[in-house]
Amino acid sequence: MANGVIPPPGGASPLPQVRVPLEEPPLSPDVEEEDDDLGKTLAVSRFGDLISKPPAWDPEKPSRSYSERDFEFHRHTSHHTHHPLSARLPPPHKLRRLPPTSARHTRRKRKKEKTSAPPSEETPPIQEEGGAGVEEEEEEEEEEEGESEAEPVEPPPSGTPQKAKFSIGSDEDDSPGLPGRAAVTKPLPSVGPQTDKSPQHSSSSPSPRAQASRLAGEKSRPWSPSASYDLRERLCPGSALGNSGGPEQQVPTDEAEAQMLGSADLDDMKSHRLEDNPGVRRHLVKKPSRTQGGRGSPSGLAPILRRKKKKKKLDRRPHEVFVELNELMLDRSQEPHWRETARWIKFEEDVEEETERWGKPHVASLSFRSLLELRRTIAHGAALLDLEQTTLPGIAHLVVETMIVSDQIRPEDRASVLRTLLLKHSHPNDDKDSGFFPRNPSSSSMNSVLGNHHPTPSHGPDGAVPTMADDLGEPAPLWPHDPDAKEKPLHMPGGDGHRGKSLKLLEKIPEDAEATVVLVGCVPFLEQPAAAFVRLNEAVLLESVLEVPVPVCFLFVMLGPSHTSTDYHELGRSIATLMSDKLFHEAAYQADDRQDLLSAISEFLDGSIVIPPSEVEGRDLLRSVAAFQRELLRKRREREQTKVEMTTRGGYTAPGKELSLELGGSEATPEDDPLLRTGSVFGGLVRDVRRRYPHYPSDLRDALHSQCVAAVLFIYFAALSPAITFGGLLGEKTEGLMGVSELIVSTAVLGVLFSLLGAQPLLVVGFSGPLLVFEEAFFKFCRAQDLEYLTGRVWVGLWLVVFVLALVAAEGSFLVRYISPFTQEIFAFLISLIFIYETFYKLYKVFTEHPLLPFYPPEGALEGSLDAGLEPNGSALPPTEGPPSPRNQPNTALLSLILMLGTFFIAFFLRKFRNSRFLGGKARRIIGDFGIPISILVMVLVDYSITDTYTQKLTVPTGLSVTPPDKRSWFIPPLGSARPFPPWMMVAAAVPALLVLILIFMETQITALIVSQKARRLLKGSGFHLDLLLIGSLGGLCGLFGLPWLTAATVRSVTHVNALTVMRTAIAPGDKPQIQEVREQRVTGVLIASLVGLSIVMGAVLRRIPLAVLFGIFLYMGVTSLSGIQLSQRLLLILMPAKHHPEQPYVTKVKTWRMHLFICIQLGCIALLWVVKSTAASLAFPFLLLLTVPLRHCLLPRLFQDRELQALDSEDAEPNFDEDGQDEYNELHMPV
């Protein structure tokens, strides 16, 4: 190099501009003589001779003619690129002398010993890039990096040649030229003649024009080796590049190029290299040293590996997002500040201006114009990706400088824009949380802030061009009417920044979320809008900016004048909504340049809907929007799935598998299916034991939580109420042979055993309506055949055990897959109708026994009848015991009607209250879940307060005793008690055993199937074969002790699982609730069954319950179960016009008359079952119910298409865990 000038490290930055006066200073004689020699060599006449005398033409070689257009095309191609000659020099930090240390001194001494001959004093050695000197410097830098940065560089003694260095600030000392580069420059003419000449200098003399340019640059700038060079002087706005008019000319300051190139080449270079591209990352590529070893050389790889270790890997993994929109507003004292107006976790929440409270979450609706303006803003604004800043002032400083360079704002607006970005932030919750000490963070004046981030270099008296920091001066007023703008409270880090944070909001934000801050507003000092999109290199916590302490990764700034047509609020909502979109914010994390962001906006527009500007009255007009949006989302998911398939096609992952896992699906293998047949005897049972019993220790540990205690209390009342209700009704059906005490004991014993040994201990074992119907039918059959009812139940139980063992051995539980909602709806509808019918039938019997008469018998006769029909405890005796019950009692029928309807309406109202808007969600759930016990307690108190009216009470024995102690005991003899049991009935008992097995199989397996849904996230698995074996085997034992058969109660089991479900708290407002975990354990089931068993000691309290209250509970169970069946909903559509039909798949995808045909088939099956149940063959109704399964799979496919059957008979109901959602009765198709 001729001058030894070292370019700055940012090689991609624009070259600095040097104002060269037209007047050239006089040159020395030596310089003129050297320029004459070079001018003769490169004279224009010499090139003219070469052009005028072309070489001899060879006809054998192909040739073509070149025109002026070809030369012009060559100048503008990529091959016509001029690299500065000074780019071959090492970086400036490699040329700085480090302070001497003992280790470095030892290495240098060792190196001098290996050198053969020292360099000459007259000719300094040339330091070649990649040579030994550079390698030594690299090693020293790698080992003593921190030491060299911390210790100041001591200047060498005067008189020794030094390396030229660049200075970032203006406080560096002047340094002489660079040794070893022949960089001994000529001083100015006023200094004196040149005294030192080197051979290298004489061999490469510059031209007079370049020499004049160099000398002029030394006058006008601190460019000469005797002055420090400031990199900030090279930074200039793009508008200054086109300033070619005037008496001065702009040329590059690279002296090597100025000496070697002509004016035409310099003009061409300016068009390519003197322009600035804001927001584009320039990566410095260092050429490897020629003296380094090869790839296999450890010495050559060691520095590279050390360098790679020091570089921190960027985390471009997409995180959950939290977006906050802040707008520039004026407070009551007319001072500007940033005010939070909206936020996004998934949906938009706006701050209501009048009440200063948050509105309901909703889907953000954007204008199409704002999206187009946002796209144009990002295309022409500043884009700073991977910005390495950790404070808001540092970020704001770089944003403002980038805006100036990209010609968005003027340099004189720097202070105002920076002051605007650093204003304080306020949030709607600040006033609520601040209390007596409101938050008012302030900082020092603007001068100190700008002084920290804009150090002003000291310029000499040589008239150098000032840098950007010189343009700040005194801060101008931010607002024209506010003269005290310098004292505005600014945002500064530190202090109690998040004192007003909302802990409730923080719980709804995911733990790994990163925030996006959107700042928009109008300012009076700008002439055009200015915008910047910033992505930080690493998410940082900016104090007092956000409402909650969430690290910030993205910032979007948009400032502009108010007289433009830009709606800054809508533009801020647009970028905030884009950042809350899943696909766009993933693209923002992985974007490498501006074009990636624009492509993501286009992808967002492809999935958006434009609503025409027409008045919309009513929600019915917007029904098609939701369907169209679902179709667009489906296509969008298909495109994403296609991308996943393309990326995983060459790997081991199946296509679409990763997408399903991301969407929340589970990777289920065929071995995990509990209903999969193994082909071996008891193979399914063995798999259930191996799957579930290893979790037995955790089933005990997981119960150590307060939520399990609350679930025990709640499910206890939920299980006790049906036990009392069905016990009282069972005593009525069996004439007192089995009643409340037997059902309570059976529920307790079987519940404890099943909870300890079952594969799914969350199932609640209890009595159900179908079993009550079967018990009534079997009792009538035994009375008709003059058989002992309890002895017949013993043989039915023994055959039940045999059939259950055979079914489990054959792995017959897989048959539950064939029981579709078609059969479940028929089953549930039939049982609900039976409940409702039995309730009003019992009420009719009460009105028959106690009619409303105009005259009643005398009071003495009434008391005598009462004394004859009542026991000392006031309970009514069974019809078969003693004298008949009292009849013709006044007001008994009316009071029974009031008690029944009162119980029904209280329980039904509390159930509706659970899904209302009053109180909080937890309070409503507690009141709704205890609706049945509350209604029973209220009506019992009403009956207890009315002392002069007779009502029939519940029959409960004293202590642990059977209901009729004089008729039976706790053990039932299999051969008969009063008379021998006929042998033919011992064999014929297999038929009712098979029928009761159908009921137990359907209820138990369907309940287990509902509980084991993937949406409920049970992790320990289930066992259909083991559960069926336990319930069937324990049912056989119940027959020996005269206890009722039990099954898995659907509603109580689902309620038990819901009570043990833990919901995620980090759910965006308005989003669907999600399950975090379910506390799967065995202790709650054991405690619930034990408490139900201990309730037998409350005989005195239970004997106060009127039977009319139990009839009200019976009516409640029938009505609520009927309301949740889809068949009843479709049945109402027959009486409804087609225009009022709901938007359901069975309405939109099936013709109306074919839907009614499907309903008629189901109603025909229900009518047939009702007829069978009402005749002497009522015992066979489970068999007819089972026939609906082949009817669905064999006959209906001939009448309906698969598409129609999928819409009419599909199990698409998912559990609803919303506090304001539906309860268990509306989710299930099973009877109570």
Swiss-Prot record:
Write out the S-palmitoyl cysteine lipidation residues: C1165
- The biased composition feature labelled Low complexity covers 200-214
Tell me the protein family, please. Answer: Belongs to the anion exchanger (TC 2.A.31) family.
Residue stretches of biased makeup (Polar residues)? 440-450
Residue list for modification Omega-N-methylarginine: R295
Q: Where in the cell is it found?
A: Cell membrane
| Pfam families, A to Z | Band_3_cyto (PF07565), HCO3_cotransp (PF00955)
- Compositionally biased intervals (Acidic residues): 134-152
Q: Which domain of life is it from?
A: Eukaryota
Listed name of the protein? Anion exchange protein 3
* Membrane-spanning intervals of the chain: 709-731, 737-774, 794-816, 826-847, 893-910, 926-946, 980-1002, 1028-1049, 1083-1128, 1155-1191
| Organism whose genome encodes this protein | Pongo abelii
Pro residues bias: start-end ranges: 1-11
Q: Name one GO biological process term.
A: regulation of intracellular pH
Which reactions is this enzyme annotated as catalysing? Answer: hydrogencarbonate(in) + chloride(out) = hydrogencarbonate(out) + chloride(in)
This protein's record includes keyword S-adenosyl-L-methionine: no
Composition skew (Basic residues), residue ranges: 76-97, 104-113, 280-289, 305-316
